[in-house]
A protein has these predicted regions:
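Small-residue-rich transmembrane alpha-helices
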Residues: 58-125, 166, 436-499
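"Rare, low-scoring activations can occur
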Residues: 1, 194-213, 277-281, 295-384, ...
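Membrane-proximal extracellular/periplasmic loop immediately following the first transmembrane helix
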Residues: 165-239, 244
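C-terminal transmembrane helical bundles of large multi-pass transporters
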Residues: 361-450, 457-460
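Hydrophobic secondary-structure segments that place a key small or acidic residue at a functional site
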Residues: 241-319
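Hydrophobic alpha-helical transmembrane segments of multi-pass inner-membrane transport and secretion
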Residues: 2-34, 62, 66-67, 142-164, ...
């Protein structure tokens, strides 16, 4: 889904850039319309004018393509660091990639030059020399479509960025159902697996170690799920997957599990089980303590029910869990240790020293449970960084596109502005008049971008069982932010036209 989103965004930004380039080329060509008229009066055909326009477009696109390749090569280390990947230039040297680049370049050249070449080459020499701005039919509609498309891109991308940020914050602050802070775990290797109680007692002599527990798997990498559980009045066609977890009686203290019914397992309860709320809801009873479940030919008495916890992922669906005491060496693969908030580094050094003395082959690998769950957000963090980068590009493209539009408007309405100023109209009124179409285009774009981004991000959020609700306020914020950037860009360029001396504006060649 993320690859599809990136592809769609890349195409959207490329199309927006092409539309903006058309706007800029059109604005520039209007300044050369008399030059084209002179060419035609000297014998140039319409095809010659089209070739000239396309030659200019091709040169600009090729220079931009070469610059893009160089920027990509220079920025690749930064990009790899940004997304924690190792992409090299050999990937771009692939024959298929090169062919795709060439095709994109040719399409960009073809689309970028078609409007100015077709429209601005059709005038007669007399019309061109006189400056036939008013003869461009439907030009305003086309340029409005360009501006609206750029607004749609910017608003949609910024909305996506805000939604991703909100989802990441939601997952970061999600209640996992247990305490992951300052809990480290390590694998019990070699001799350590045969004497877990001795290791635990040794570690607990340190006052900065609050609790320790042997476990079959850490909650961040839970395995061993299976079917085959039986209970009274269970439907014959219902056989859910249940995660089977082993932990000693101190597990409830180490991870601060919350019991909602009964109590946690005690020493000697080898034929008892504790289940989570999700498993209890699948069973469907109103009371569980003391009742019996069966699996693999054994009966297990339910000692209690604990509140649901997140395992293996942050945004995944809650899974049914059954907890047993370790049975000999089975279920004692790891040990989890809860550390007090003071002197954490010294406590970690103490743990490593003791384990190295007991098992020389110990790899010195202590893993914070909190780091595991933080790492689970790496794909979302990478997506957030890339979408933010795309959004920055989109807003930059928006600013360039508006520059082209204002260049065109200022060129076309120079005399109109001069007449209005000579009749006493204030600069503020002139600026407001020229801003009005921009604001209208922004509002129309917001009406289109909002359902589009809402639909796409709703599709993306389906990746998560635990997710935020999309709020209309996000799209309002995105629209206001984009409009603010747009208005600032326009005001920077429009002030020159509005403050120009009306005598200079009305002077004809």
């Amino acid at each position: 889904k993320n690859i599809g989103i990136f592809t769609l965004i890349g195409i959207l930004i490329l199309c927006t850039a092409i539309l903006n380039f058309i706007n800029l080329i059109t604005a520039r060509s209007l300044k050369q319309i008399r030059e084209n008229g002179i060419r035609k009066s000297l014998g140039a055909t319409r095809l010659d004018v089209v070739k000239f326009i396309y030659s200019e477009v091709s040169i600009v696109c090729i220079i931009a393509f070469v610059a893009a390749v160089l920027i990509t090569a220079m920025g690749l280390p930064f990009f790899n660091q940004l997304i924690n990947k190792d992409i090299n230039l050999e990937t771009l040297a692939n024959a298929q990639v090169i062919k795709a680049f060439i095709v994109v370049l040719l399409i960009t050249i073809g689309l970028s030059g078609v409007y100015p070449a077709v429209v601005l080459s059709r005038y007669s020499p007399v019309q061109s020399i006189r400056g036939a701005f008013s003869q461009v039919r439907n030009g305003g509609l086309f340029r409005n479509a360009l501006v609206i498309s750029v607004f749609i891109s910017s608003i949609a991308l910024l909305s996506a960025t805000l939604i991703i940020n909100k989802q990441i914050r939601y997952l970061q602050n999600l209640d996992l159902g247990f305490e992951k802070e300052r809990v480290v775990y390590f694998r019990l290797n070699g001799n350590m697996k045969q004497q877990p109680n001795a290791i635990k007692n040794m570690l607990l002599t340190n006052p900065n170690i609050v609790s320790a527990s042997t476990i079959s798997h850490p909650p961040s990498a839970m395995g061993n799920n299976g079917q085959g559980w039986q209970w009274e009045n269970k439907p014959l066609d219902f056989d859910p997957l249940v995660f089977n977890w082993n932990g000693d009686p101190d597990l409830v203290k180490t991870l601060q599990l919350h019991m909602s019914e009964g109590s946690f397992l005690q020493e000697g309860q080898t034929h008892s089980v504790v289940i989570n709320r999700c498993f209890a809801q699948l069973i469907g009873w109103s009371h569980f303590t003391g009742k019996t479940l069966s699996a693999w030919g054994n009966d297990y008495q339910i000692a209690g029910v604990f509140e649901d916890i997140n395992i293996n992922s942050l945004g995944g669906a809650t899974q049914p869990i059954a907890v047993f005491l370790p049975d000999g060496g089975w279920g004692q693969n790891f040990m989890a240790v809860k550390i007090a908030p003071q002197d954490v580094d010294e406590t970690l050094t103490y743990i490593r020293k003791k384990l190295d003395a007991m098992e020389p082959a110990f790899i010195n690998e202590l893993t914070f449970l909190e780091d595991d769950f933080t790492q689970m957000l790496e794909p979302e963090n990478n997506l957030q960084k890339l979408i933010s980068l795309f959004t920055l590009f989109s807003i930059l493209v928006l600013a360039l596109g508006l520059t082209g539009m204002i260049m065109y408007m200022a060129e076309k309405k120079t005399k109109e502005i001069g007449i209005r100023k000579s009749l006493g109209e204030e600069n503020l009124s002139i600026v407001s008049r020229m801003l009005s179409p921009l604001l209208t285009a922004g509002l129309v774009a917001a009406l289109i971008a909002t359902p589009l981004a809402w639909s796409l991000m709703g599709y993306w959020l389906q990746n998560y069982a635990k997710r935020i609700d999309i709020d209309i306020l996000i799209f309002i914020q995105a629209t206001l932010a984009v409009m603010l950037v747009a208005c600032a860009t326009v005001l920077l360029h429009i002030s020159n036209a509005a403050t120009k001396n009306p005598v200079d504006a009305l002077r004809s060649e």
